[in-house]
UniProtKB/Swiss-Prot annotation:
The record marks E106 as: Required for sensing abasic sites. Sensor of abasic sites in single-stranded DNA (ssDNA) required to preserve genome integrity by promoting error-free repair of abasic sites. Recognizes and binds abasic sites in ssDNA at replication forks and chemically modifies the lesion by forming a covalent cross-link with DNA: forms a stable thiazolidine linkage between a ring-opened abasic site and the alpha-amino and sulfhydryl substituents of its N-terminal catalytic cysteine residue. The N-terminal catalytic Cys-2 residue forms a thiazolidine linkage to a ring-opened DNA abasic site. Glu-106 catalyzes reversal of the thiazolidine linkage; self-reversal is favoured by duplex DNA formation. Glu-106 is also involved in sensing abasic sites in single-stranded DNA (ssDNA). His-163 stabilizes the abasic sites by forming a hydrogen bond with the O4' hydroxyl group. One of its GO terms (molecular function) is lyase activity. Keywords: Covalent protein-DNA linkage, DNA damage, DNA-binding, Hydrolase, Lyase, Protease, SOS response. This is Abasic site processing protein YoqW. SUPFAM superfamilies: BB1717-like. Its EC number is 4.-.-.-, 3.4.-.-. The modification Thiazolidine linkage to a ring-opened DNA abasic site is found at C2. The gene is yoqW. The lineage of its organism: Bacteria, Bacillati, Bacillota, Bacilli, Bacillales.
Amino acid sequence: MCGRFTLFSEFDDIIEQFNIDQFLPEGEYHPSYNVAPSQNILTIINDGSNNRLGKLRWGLIPPWAKDEKIGYKMINARAETLSEKPSFRKPLVSKRCIIPADSFYEWKRLDPKTKIPMRIKLKSSNLFAFAGLYEKWNTPEGNPLYTCTIITTKPNELMEDIHDRMPVILTDENEKEWLNPKNTDPDYLQSLLQPYDADDMEAYQVSSLVNSPKNNSPELIESH
């Protein structure tokens, strides 16, 4: 799964790397060393002509949901079953997004009682993007609430020693294909959702301070 990540890169670097044409005011971007579910996170969609950077709440709420509690259970979506699940079938075809990040955290189980937090990043330290889906849900008051989920897949050789799932990190080319609204074939779209090349990634243990979303400082990414 993917339940925590970082995004502390410079705002201008995000705009440049992902070819953003329309974006929220820079003052609304808050670098984070501990992005957690239920927070409003930076996301990118394509409207058919432009890449747009905005915010969606992490934890997808389907349009048919009775209340927003289901969102806490839907922070991730399995790549292998997207086209089978009622919550993800339609957004797979028409509501895709990418989520910029510079690393993510996963907890490695050492024994039944012990788990240690690991930080996983690209060896290059470059920005990357998770594949995601988004949805619109209307609150009981009739206000629209836009939410998203991060897609996971089977682990690569690096991740399989840490966890049995990993977030889908898209290659540059697959980012474009994933965002392109003209792509509507579920089989093709799911073929883009592959484990990232382990040779280009690295992982190391970090402080247990990351366990709490309340903690958010540069020391969270320091090797422990």
